[in-house]
Regions:
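Alpha-helical interaction segments
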Residues: 19, 46-48
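Beta-strand-rich modules
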Residues: 48-68
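Short beta-strand elements bearing conserved aromatic residues within extracellular beta-rich modules
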Residues: 27-31
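Short beta-strand segments within Ig-like beta-sandwich modules, predominantly Fibronectin type-III
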Residues: 36-43
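Predominantly extracellular/luminal cell-surface or secreted proteins
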Residues: 32-34, 62
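Pro/Thr/Ser/Gly-rich low-complexity, intrinsically disordered linker/stalk tracts
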Residues: 1-25, 53, 66-72
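Generic structural microfeature
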Residues: 12, 26, 43-46, 56
Length: 72
């Protein structure tokens, strides 16, 4: 699977989770920010809101089995 940064603002990011699905991903993924799960998603494009400006974040993606699929 590939993870791409689609858009970044001071308080949000939009990600593309490319696992071969068109609108929906082929499975559900967990989105982690600095190691903490913040949401689950089954859509190819997903967004995270409420981020703080001038702050570094590690955004990771895991499948339902907890296998790390990538990070930004």
């Amino acid at each position: 699977m590939e993870i791409r940064l689609v858009m970044k603002t001071a308080r949000s990011v939009s990600l593309e989770l490319d696992d071969g699905g068109i609108y929906k991903t082929k499975e559900v993924y967990r989105i982690l920010v600095n190691g903490d799960e913040v949401k689950t998603t089954d859509t190819v494009i997903t967004s995270l809101y409420g981020l703080k400006p001038d702050t570094d974040y590690e955004i990771g993606v895991e499948d339902a089995r907890g296998t790390r699929q990538g990070e930004i």
